[in-house]
């Protein structure tokens, strides 16, 4: 998993509340267990028309936001089913941070496991970030995880809270396997001791 320290990039405003995981990645994309290639399915029912052509009105199809790294979203983002494909699709598209006032619990946890930073902010801060994001190509936000700050294009700042353990994992690029490998020496020592003490086993 890639480390998350400081992220600077265009923020796309998605002013929709209660975006569920079915909307983030529709069911037809759930047949794969690969984490790559799902970016094409991200919000596919909103990004594409019935004939397969792009919907020019959807935010991520607008030229200024095609390479967005941050998504500023309405309340209760990622609610609904537990599909881990939702953060996979966001990550494959290039989004590494989602900012909202609240998230679906399972989606929130899955983001951390996949290297995405979900940030909870107040409604006042979200409204300001929506204003910043609507600047289009100038809608660059800086996400400073170490200092737990969001910096806007005009120099404004918003702070956020994060669990220290999850912060440690993101800063060091540690997924579940990485966390286990951090304890490799202790695991090896335990196994060596167990073999010596229970040679008969």
From Swiss-Prot:
CDD domains linked to this entry: IPMI_Swivel
EC number(s) reported in the record: 4.2.1.33
Transmembrane segments: none
Domain of life (superkingdom): Bacteria
Catalytic activity: (2R,3S)-3-isopropylmalate = (2S)-2-isopropylmalate
The UniProt record lists the keyword Lyase: yes
GO biological process: L-leucine biosynthetic process
Keywords: Amino-acid biosynthesis, Branched-chain amino acid biosynthesis, Leucine biosynthesis, Lyase
Gene Ontology CC terms: 3-isopropylmalate dehydratase complex
Family, per entry: Belongs to the LeuD family. LeuD type 1 subfamily.
Subunit-level organization: Heterodimer of LeuC and LeuD.
Role according to the record: Catalyzes the isomerization between 2-isopropylmalate and 3-isopropylmalate, via the formation of 2-isopropylmaleate.
Protein name: 3-isopropylmalate dehydratase small subunit
Organism the protein comes from: Nitrobacter hamburgensis (strain DSM 10229 / NCIMB 13809 / X14)
